Amino acid sequence: MSDNRSHIEEKYQWDLTTVFATDELWETEVVELTQAIDNAKGFSGHLLDSSQSLLEITEVELDLSRRLEKVYVYASMKNDQDTTVAKYQEFQAKATALYAKFSETFSFYEPELLQLSESDYQSFLLEMPDLQKYDHFFEKIFANKPHVLSQNEEELLAGASEIFGAAGETFEILDNADMVFPVVKNAKGEEVELTHGNFISLMESSDRTVRKEAYQAMYSTYEQFQHTYAKTLQTNVKSQNFKARVHHYQSARQSALSANFIPEEVYETLIKTVNHHLPLLHRYMKLRQKVLGLDDLKMYDVYTPLSQMDMSFTYDEALKKSEEVLAIFGEVYSERVHRAFTERWIDVHVNKGKRSGAYSGGSYDTNAFMLLNWQDTLDNLYTLVHETGHSLHSTFTRENQPYVYGDYSIFLAEIASTTNENILTETLLKEVKDDKNRFAILNHYLDGFKGTIFRQTQFAEFEHAIHVADQEGQVLTSEYLNNLYAELNEKYYGLTKEDNHFIQYEWARIPHFYYNYYVFQYATGFAAANYLAERIVNGNPEDKEAYLNYLKAGNSDYPLNVIAKAGVDMTSADYLDAAFRVFEERLVELENLVAKGVHND
C-alpha cells in the first residue's frame, strides 16, 4: 500500500479502459451526446402523435440515458480514485451538467405519456407490437397518474425543488462544514480534534474514559445547536408532508413508499415485529455489560467490540476465502465472481486523494466495479463479500434484462449484499472451531444485527412519529424531539434516559432523517438476507435457483413480487421472526462462551 497511486500495482487498480479506452474518447462521446440531446428537443409535444412516435421517442430517451450513464460512471470513478486531480473534477462536473440537460430535455415525457387513455394505449400496443416490451415500464408510470397534477402545477412545484431541498442542504452545511467539535484524547493519550470521521473509532476504543469523553464532547456540541437542528428537521418534515398532500397521498410515508410500490404494511410489520423482539436486544446489552465488567452500561459502551481478537486476512487471502464461500451459488455465479476478482473490477488499496469507504458501481454497459480501501481485517473481508454481492446482482440483472429493466430498486439492493455477508458468517461458524475466533465472529454478527435491524428500525419509528406529529399540528421543537428520541432509545436499549442524558440529542446528527423514509430498507433488507442465507446454506437446490432468479429479475416486476419469487413475503412477519431466531441462537452461543470465560482468556 502506498500514498501515491502510481506506486500501486496495476492488478490492484480497476481497469477503466474497459469503459473508455482513453480520456479523448470520453470527451468525444460527451460532444456527440450533447448534440444528440439537443436534437431531441424537438420531440416535446409529439410523444403521442402515433404509436410509432411513442416507440421511437421512448427508445431515443432510453438510448441517450444508457450512453449518459456510461459517461457518468467513467467521470465519477476517475474522480473517486484520486479526488485531487483537477481534470477529473472537471469531467465529473461536465457529466453532472449533461445529466441536468438530459432531464430538462425529456421533462415532457411523463406528463405527455399520462395524457394517453387506456383505450388509446391498447390500440397503440395492437398497432405497434414492439411497444409490448415496455409494458411494465409504462405501467409503473401510469400507476402514478392519480398523483400527478396539471403540467403547470408540476412545473411550479419543480421550480420550487431547491426550496424544498433547502432544509437538507442546510443540515449538510451546518453538520459538515460549520460544526466544530472539541479536542479529545485518543487511546494513546494524544489530543485529537473530534470529527464525524473519527467519532466511531473513538467509541470503539477499549478505554472507557476515551469513549465517555468523545461521547460527551459530540453530544454536548449538538446540545448547543439543538434549536437550529430542530428547525431544519421540522422544515424538512413539513416539506415532505406538503408535497404528499398536494399530490393526493394520505401521508408522506405513503408517498415515499409508493415510489417502489411498497405497501405501508411492510413498514408497520417491521416496527411491530422488532418491538416484539426488543427483549433480545436487552439481553445482548446485559451480556455486553458482563463482558466489559461494568456495574452500569452506558450508551458510550455499546460500540466497543467485545472481542479484542481480530481475525486477519490479507487481500489475496480474502479473495480466496470469498471465492470458496460464494461457490455455494453454483458454477455460473462462481465464474462471474472469479472474473470480478481477476479482471480488475476492483480498486483495492488506499491512496492519496481516494474516496473513502467502499461501493459497487458501474452502468449497464460496463463491469460492475468495486471501490475498496483495504485493511487486513475480518471487517474488510465482510466488506469484500458485501460489495461483491452488489456487483453480482448488477451483473446478473444486466445479463438477463434489456436496458429498460436493467437496474433494481433500492428496496432490493441491500438484500443481495447482506445475503453474502450472512453466508460468510454461516460458513465461518461451520469451519472455525477455536473459541476465541468463534467469539469474534459471533460478536461481529450480533453487532451488525444490532446496528442494522434494531437501530435502523428505531430510526424508522422516530421518522414516522415526527411526520405524523407534524400532520397533527404538533410543533417539532427541540424539547419535543429530545423527549421522543430519549423515550425511544430507552425502549430499544433498556438503558434509562436519566442515566444517558446526552443520547436525547442523537436525532440531530442523523442525515438519514432528511432522506425521506429510506432507513427502514436497511432493516428489511438485512432481515430478508438472514432468512435467505439460512435457506441457501441449509436448504435445497430449488432455494438457490429461486435466489438467482431474484438476482436476474432487475426491474422487470414490482420489488415485492421479485423478492417473493426468492421465497420472502415481506408483508408478513415470518421473515423477520426467522431472522430473530438466528440472532437468538447466536446470542445463546456467545452467552455460553462467556460462561466458559472465553472473553477473559
From Swiss-Prot:
GO terms for molecular function: metal ion binding; metalloendopeptidase activity. It is an enzyme of class 3 (hydrolase). Its main location: cytoplasm. Its EC number is 3.4.24.-. GO terms for cellular component: cytoplasm. The keyword Cell division does not apply. Its cofactor is Zn(2+). Zn(2+) binds at residues 386, 390, 393. This is Group B oligopeptidase PepB. It comes from Streptococcus agalactiae serotype III (strain NEM316).
